[in-house]
Curated annotation (Swiss-Prot):
GO biological process, any: mesoderm formation
Organism the protein comes from: Xenopus tropicalis
Described purpose of this protein according to its UniProt entry: Acts as a transcriptional activator during early development, limiting the extent of mesoderm formation in the gastrula. Binds to DNA via the target sequence 5'-GT[AC]AACA-3', with 5'-GTAAACA-3' being the preferred binding site.
Name listed for the protein in its UniProt record: Forkhead box protein A2
The gene coding this protein: foxa2
PROSITE patterns: FORK_HEAD_1 (PS00657), FORK_HEAD_2 (PS00658), FORK_HEAD_3 (PS50039)
Length: 434
């Protein structure tokens, strides 16, 4: 350290001209008292404030003290403390090398050499804060928070779109449009994610391609959920699949395949049964290209396998309704072997599709679900017990107490209409796309 000071000693004029303006400090002792309180500082300040005759020795002592003390300084970093000592040593060596320089100028030089580093250290928190609080360029943000990527997989998005549709089937362009309407993130880079949607539809067994019927002209085939796929997502939460659906064999029109296709339509959603029932009842038995043609053929196969009377087979509409009511009763036992058939919670989860849609859509979507009414009652009671009634729920305190204590009182309460129920849960959608 001292060798470096001796080597740079002849540049004392450069140092004094570089830090030209003297900083005004009351004494070196006050400045060091703020840094730490050890007895070395007392000696350092006394030696710096000694008479002009002893100034060179004092400043030399100052350089030694600063060099040895630099790791223990509290206000300054060790490297800066060493630099301060070097600057002081340069100033004191200048008083040795140039006899024409008075000891007072050496003191001023040592003060000037010491002052800028100390000044820089005292200003460094302000510099740091200004760097932290500096306003960022808005271009550095990729997008705002409302346009962040949704936490759903592509299979979840497709399943949501298909399940909310009235006929439980959508074309590819309708799936695209539904996703873009609900999630603003997917309004950009459409080519990338739409390619992934097509791959997900093609390579997953839970999605079936349904040919377009002549009574529905247009472009593109329909996509629907496999009737056996069941409740793929945990309690209607689309964030995680509980089981990957795999077809054991390709569904055929034989008896086994027909039974496989006919079962499980209510595990996708209860409205699928009512819509398929009405479509089977309305269409003629010879229109083989109806949207539910696989299910109709499977029902005919089931009819032939059960050996019903020929006069019963003359009315295929009543036949289909009868078979549908039959396989409704069998469905609960068969579905337990595949996936958990917990439909009670399927459509009223914080991340479910009903809470993403507005209340009008929910009312329209669940218009056919009057037979699921008691399940919605259970959900409302659970919501009141768990103290979630603050989300815009118009229920009074007495009604909330009756949900906890008296279940029959709840079922006769005025909350039993669909519109009041859904407007009570959420008056507006959680993720609106505006």
């Amino acid at each position: 350290m001292l060798g470096a000071v001796k080597m740079e000693g002849h540049e004392a004029t450069d140092w004094s001209s570089y830090y030209g303006e003297p900083e005004a400090y009351s004494s070196v002792g006050n400045m060091n008292a703020g840094l730490s309180m050890n007895p070395m500082n007392t000696y350092m300040s006394m030696s710096a404030m000694s008479t002009s005759a002893n100034m060179t020795a004092g400043s030399m002592n100052m350089s030694y003290v600063n060099t040895g003390m630099s790791p223990s300084l509290t206000g300054m970093s060790p490297g800066t403390g060493a630099m301060t000592g070097m600057g002081t040593g340069v100033a004191s060596m200048a008083s040795h090398l140039s006899p024409s320089m008075s000891p007072m100028s050496a003191q001023a030089t040592s003060m000037n050499a010491l002052a800028p580093y100390t000044n820089m250290n005292s200003m460094s928190p302000i510099y740091g804060q200004s760097n932290i609080n500096r306003s960022r360029d808005p271009k550095t943000y990729r997008r705002s928070y409302t346009h962040a990527k949704p936490p759903y997989s592509y299979i979840s998005l497709i399943t949501m779109a298909i399940q909310q549709s009235p006929n439980k089937m959508l074309t590819l362009s309708e799936i695209y449009q539904w996703i873009m309407d609900l999630f603003p993130f997917y309004r950009q880079n459409q080519q990338r994610w739409q390619n992934s949607i097509r791959h997900s539809l093609s390579f997953n067994d839970c999605f079936l391609k349904v040919p377009r019927s002549p009574d529905k002209p247009g472009k593109g085939s329909f996509w629907t959920l496999h009737p056996d796929s069941g409740n793929m997502f945990e309690n209607g939460c689309y964030l995680r699949r509980q089981k990957r659906f795999k077809c054991e064999k390709k569904p055929s029109l034989r008896e086994g395949g027909g039974k496989k296709l006919s079962e499980g339509s209510s595990s996708v959603g209860s409205a699928a049964n009512s819509s398929s029932e009405s479509s089977v009842g309305n269409e003629s038995p010879h229109s083989s290209s109806s949207p539910c043609q696989e299910q109709k053929r499977s029902l005919v196969d089931m009819k032939s396998s059960q050996g019903l009377s020929p006069d019963h087979a003359a009315s295929p509409a009543s036949q289909a309704q009868h078979l549908l009511s039959q396989h409704h009763s069998v469905l609960s036992h068969e579905a337990q072997s595949h996936l958990k058939p917990e439909h009670h919670y399927s459509f009223n989860h914080p991340f479910s599709i009903n809470n993403l849609m507005s209340s009008e859509q929910q009312h329209h979507h669940h218009h056919h679900h009057n037979h699921h009414h008691h399940h919605k009652m259970d959900l409302k009671a659970y919501e009141q017990v768990m103290h979630y009634s603050g989300y815009g729920s118009p229920m009074t305190g007495s009604l909330a107490m009756s949900t906890v204590t008296n279940k029959s009182g709840l079922e006769s309460s005025p909350i039993s209409s669909d519109t009041s129920y859904y407007q009570g849960v959420y008056s507006r959608p959680i993720m609106n796309s505006s």
